[in-house]
C-alpha cells in the first residue's frame, strides 16, 4: 500500500492533520508582530563636538581629525563621514548592516576616550547619539501658539510632554526639534563696558566664579544628621543682575550696568514651521524591536490626554504619521490577497466546470496560507509588506498542487474508475511529482535566504515564507485533497452541459496540441536551435535592462532640501522657505507641510492627500514642484522622496570624490564633474556640498604690539572669544531644571566685521584699548564646511535623476566623468541610496547561479539522472526571456523585486517540466517509445499545466494593476511573473519535449537491458 493511501482510507486522520495546521496557524496570526519591512538593524552613531567660535578649519584640524583617526579603529563600521562647520564637528559612523550597535558603540566610546586629551581645552565633551532602524522618526507632533514664545513652548514640552511620550511602551526617544531651550542671556554693551573699564572676559570670569554650584555635605552628631546647602549659586534674574563683575576700590560694577540680563534662548538659529505656522516638533522614534503599528497606536491613544493638558493658547497634534503609508500598503496587499483568491477560484471553476471539483482547491488555498503563519512564527518572522507579498504569490503556488490532484482524479474517473479508486491511483501517481515540485520550489529560495546584504536581510522572510507555504501546500495536497476527492466526487451518469462544453474545448486543444507537437518534433533540431537563440537573448536583455535598487514608492510625501547663499542667516533662509511653502500649498494635492530652517539651508516635507483623492502621484508632483521651485531666485531647491527601502537617507544619487589633495584642487575637480552632470540632462537637480564661497574675515594680530603691551595671544583670543563666541559659562537652576548662562555682545554691536575692531580689551596695566590697536582685518573666501569621507578630503555630489536614465547608468556616467576630468589621486565612492545600490549590484547573478545549481542537484536526486534535470531546467531561460522582454520595454526595471520575481519564476516554470518528464519516464517504463512517451505525457499534462499557469498568472494580475500605497514594488514583481510565466509556458510546451528527445534518458532501453 502506498503511503498516500493511508490518508484516503482514514479520513479522520487526514482531517486531524488539517485541523492541526488550521489551529496552529490561527493561533500564530494573533501573535505575529506587524511591521513595514522585516527587522534589520541599520545603526548610525553620530559624534557631535562643540567648540564655540572656532572656524571650520580649526574644527577639522584640532577636533575632527584626531577623533576620526581613533574612531576608525573600531570594528563594525561600514564608512565614516564628517562635517566641520563653524563651532561644531559632526562625525557619522555608519555601521555595517545588522552589526551589533551596542558592541560598536562601546568600541567607539573607548576610542574617543583615548584622544580626549588631544582636543582643545575650550572644546565641549563629544556627545554620542545612536540611531537604530528607521532613518526618520515614525511620527512627528507639532506644537504652536500665537501667544507663547518658542522657548516657553519648548520648556513645557521638556517638562510635561516629552516625559509622557518617552514613557509610552516601545518609544525609543521623543526628540524635540526646532525648540529653543531657556537660557540666561547677558547681552553685553561694549560702550558701557569700555566706559566702566570692564572686558568681556571679566564678565565671563565673574559668572564662573560667583555662580558656583557646591555640595558641602552634612553635619553628623551622635543622634542627628543634617544636610548642608551652600548658597553659592544664583537662581533669579535679579541675582544675576546684581552680580559683581568688577571692584576697583570702593567702586563696584554690577552686571546690569554693562549688560541686559534676560531669560532668552540658547540659540536663535533654527525655525520650524507646520503649514506656515511657527512650531516646535517632537520626533517620536520607535525602538528597533518594537511593533511599529502598535507603538503608533499607543502614541495616538495618549495624544488626547496631552492635548487636554496644554496651556491656554497652545495647540498640538500629530503632523506626520509614517504608519499611515504602512497601514495603507498592508491594506492594499490584503485586498490583493482576497482578489487573488477570488480570481483563482473562478479560474478553477472555468477549467473544471464542476462546483464539487472547485471545493477541494478552495479549501486547500486558505488552509495552506493559514498554516504558513505558524511556520512564520517558528522562524521568528513578522507580518510585513514582503511576507504578505509572498502570501499573494503563494496563492498561485498552493493551489497548483490541489489543481493537479483534482484534475488527475477527474481524468481517471472519466476513464471509468470510482471516486475512491481514482483518488488512490491519482495520489500514487502524483506523490513523486508533487514531492519533487515542493522540494524544488523550496530549494529555489534557499540562495535568497543566504544572499546577505540588504536584499538578503529583507527578502529572507519573503523567500522562506513562500517556501513555508509551498511545504504546507504539499502536505495538504497529499493528505487532505485526495481524501476530499474520494468523498466529494460522485459517479455521475452524465456530466452537465457546462462540463461537457469545457471538456469538448479541452479535447480540441488536446488534439490540436498533440498533432502540432508531433509535427514539430519531426524537426526537433530547429526547436533546439530556437531555444539556444532565446538563451542568448536572455544574456543580452539582462545586460541592457534598466536597473535600480528598488522602484520609487508613492509614500504620500515629497521632501524638499534647499541651500541658500553662503553667508545667509536663518531670517534670510526663512524668506526662501516661505516662498517654497507658498508654491506647494497652492497645489490641489497639497494637504499640509513641515519645514525646518537654519542658516544657509532648509529642509521640509509636503504631505499629500490620500492616494484616492489626487490625480498626480508623488513622482509627478515631485517633478512639477522641482520646475516651479527652480524659479525662486537666490536658492537651490531639490525635490525628492524617501528611499523605497530602509537603511539609507538623503538624495537618491550621492557620489563622493575622495582625495588627499587640497580643497581648492578638489573643488576644481568637483566643479568640473558638476558642470558635466548639469549639462548631461540626466538630473532634475544636482549640487556639491563643497562650496568655497563663504566670506571669512581674518583678524590679523600684530604680535609685536601685543608683546609691547605686555599681553599674550591667549589673553587677546580669550577676550574676543568671550565677547563673540556665544559659549556658555555654567548653569543656573529654575524650578528643578538647569539652564545655561551665556554672555555675548548684543547683536547691534556685531552686525559687521569692522565693529570687532572697536571692541575694548584690557591690558595687564588695566588700560582699555580698542582691538584695532593691535589687529587688522583681512578678507578671504573659505569652504562653507570641511568634509571628510573615510578620513579623506571629500566632495559629495548629490542629485535627483530624471526618469530617463537608470540608477546603474547614472552612476557609471558619474564614474566615467570623474575619470575624464580628474588627474591621478582622486577616487570615487558612494553614500546613501547609491551606496546601497552598489553593494547589492552583482549579487543577483550569484544567487541565480546557486538557485539553478541547487535545483539541478535536487532534481538529479529525485530522478536518479543528470539528464532529466537539464531537460526540466531548459524551461528556465525561456521564462526569463519572456520577463526580460517587458523589463526592456520599460514596463518596470531590474530591481530587487523583479530579481526575486525572476528567481520565483524559475521555480514556477520548472514545475511544468517536472510534470511532463516524470510522466514520460513512466510511459517509457511501461513500454512506450521515447517519442510516443513524450508526446502523450505532454498532451495529458497539458490541461493541469494550463490550469496551474492560468491560476498563477491571473492570481498575480492584481499585482500587475496595483495602485495606491506600495504599488510600485508589487507591480514590478507581478509584471515579471505574469509575463515570464505566460511566455515561458508557451515555449516550454514545445522546447521541453524537443530537449527530451535530444538528451532525455531512454528508459525503455534501460528497462530492456535490465530484463
Regions found by a protein language model. Name each.
Residues 1-341, 383, 457, 643-645, ...:
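Membrane-proximal extracytoplasmic
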Residues 322, 388, 631-1006:
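C-terminal transmembrane helical bundles of large multi-pass transporters
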Residues 2-8, 12, 287-291, 327-384, ...:
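Interfacial segments of transmembrane alpha-helices in multi-pass membrane proteins
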